[in-house]
Amino acid sequence: MFFQNIMIYLFSLLLIPLIVYFLLIYIRLRYSNNSNNQIKTIGLTTLIINLILSMIIFILFDFSSKQFQLQLEEIYKISYFDLYLGIDGISIYFLLLTTMIMPISLVANWNSIDSKNVLSFVIIILLLETLLLAVFLVLDILLFYIFFESILPPLFLLIGLFGSSDKVRASFYLFLYTLLGSLFMLLSIITMSSIMGATAFDALSKANFSYITQLFLFYGIFISFAVKTPTIFLNTWLLKAHVESPLAGSVILAGIVWKLRWYGIFRLIIPLLPKASMDYTYIVYVIGVITIFYTSFSTLRTIAIKELIAYSSVSHAAVYLLSAFSNTIQGIEGAIALGLAHGFVSSGLFICVGGILYDRSSTRLITYYRGMAQLMPIFCILFLYITLGNCGSPLTLNFIGEFMSLYGIFERISVLGVLASTSIVFSAAYTIFMFNRIAFGGQFSSYFFNYVKDLSKREFILLISLVVPAVFFGIYPAVILDGLHYSVSGLIYN
């Protein structure tokens, strides 16, 4: 009976944080004094419970099937649709990534949130996890859009309340750019619903839209995802959002939120619009290659470390975008592996720069750093592992993801595959430069003093929890690739 009801775990992933929301309000009202540690502990415990639940779901999941599993149907009927939940061999990995990154984001800001705003911060984190998980769990395209856009208000508040000096402008940039871009996707969803009379993924996957209809739907959905990924000419909001965001915001943005757009490609474009996605791949590839070159050159010239990491993330996102449209098993599996690796590595880089180093120096300019290996040797060792992961070095999951992604791109359009492979050279150039300047570069800067401490226990746990999966899955990628094979095959050949 226990195993027959495991689909309840999916609903529990969404319900538990909402229950804790009211519990936290009660604690604040009942224990008004000295309850901040209790609030943070309860929030962290909730996130860890969700992580354990997602691991149980992963263990019980049947990877030999390409169908949605553990489906929980008709939880609640809402006027035009029912709430359907389910997972497949693709969404389960993003589910795990979300439940791993969210507790890390909370612990990353454990000591840096003003005592008056701890309750608001924890509630926003819990609400974000609920909405993020809902995007990966729902089996309805309209619900996908609703939860997809519902993430914007909590992110707006997270940056607007807890960000840096220009936080208000950054939060409005993020909100307005991404919201306006989503209008194109909403129009596409309304069109599909009016044609088919249904919004469930299963029903829409059986649709045979005309070529002209597919073309308009493709451009509508792709423009929305291109704004949110972001790609060239549509990335104005990116630097503001990352630079002004609190550490937790940067970790969530790069580690999870970007994956929603990539995941949407596998749900809305490739299976529902196969002809348009095949015929107009070259447009996506040209945009992706231009994005790689633009962001790589921008990264090479910046002196702000947080901007460097943000541009680096866009460059890797462009490789992911190209491989997602490769229409090959190797390319799509590589894209998903690269997305997971990017979640670990980009989160680690932001914690190293926006958290550990910034807490000790109050600056993010690379010109102030050198010789940190003399002061913080343990930090520099873990920082090195994360840096090598960002370069796509062997024995890291990034290497597996980038190699398979570039192979898929080359199989699809060889010339653009060769151009896309320059991302490896560029990423090595700016990432190794960043590490060399921070860790070595001679005697440590007079900007720092001899009493600068190495990693605390909290910081060490944060970094090691990101380094271990990135290295483990790089050495043994079969855990991911074997599980993806059936679902990716069904995505391409159905």
From Swiss-Prot:
Example GO molecular function: ubiquinone binding
Location within or outside the cell: Mitochondrion membrane
Organism: Trichophyton rubrum (Athlete's foot fungus)
NCBIfam families tied to this protein: NDH_I_M
Protein name according to UniProt: NADH-ubiquinone oxidoreductase chain 4
EC id: 7.1.1.2
Family that this chain belongs to: Belongs to the complex I subunit 4 family.
GO cellular component terms attached to this protein's record: mitochondrial membrane
Protein topology in the membrane: Multi-pass membrane protein
GO biological process, one term: electron transport coupled proton transport
PANTHER family recorded: NADH-UBIQUINONE OXIDOREDUCTASE CHAIN 4
Gene name for this UniProt entry: ND4
Short name of one Pfam family: Proton_antipo_M
